[in-house]
Amino acid sequence: MELHILDCSNYIYAGSFSKKFIARGVRESNNEYQANEAPIGGVRFLLRQISGLMRPGVDIMPVFDRVPEIKREMYANTFGNEGYKANRPSKKIDITGQQAYAEQILRDVGFPVQAVDGYEADDVIYSLVKYYKNDYEKIYIHTKDSDLFFLVDTNVSIARVGDQGKEIDIYSYPLLVKSGEHTLYNTVHLRKLCRGD
């Protein structure tokens, strides 16, 4: 059995650049409908990728972000400011609406969607891998988030997000994780502890 854990925001963001839209009616105050277009490219891309993974012996677990209130609070208490991801530039495309729409679709069709208020997807993915590690022959984490690369182990690999990102397993880990360094998969916890990202 395989478990594929998907960091859905990666897929939605990547697919959002396709500029696909869906027409939706919006009731106006004068009781007339006016066409309104909503972006759908990210949702479409995510659903296509999921359909490509569906086969016997494969479980698929989509994971969605929530506002990282817990980390922000911890950061503020530890460092005395609100700086957790505060200095990052805003993304070129806002995917919030598409994330909500994709999550609703996946829940409605019966996928075991995971999202925990106060936490980002990478926090939830870490917990899922630790919980299910011994229940599956192979776990694939579909993400471009390098913070999750330390989870690579004998039965845990990083999978691409569509055509983007890296495929990382214990054999390719030393060559792909940190450019110009030779880092063995089973030493990454120590490296992150000593040197950070």
Regions found by a protein language model. Give the residues of each.
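Domain-level signal for Mg2+-assisted phosphodiester chemistry and nucleotide/NA-binding surfaces
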Residues: M1-R107
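Extended two-metal-dependent nuclease catalytic cores across DNA- and RNA-processing enzymes
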Residues: K85-D197
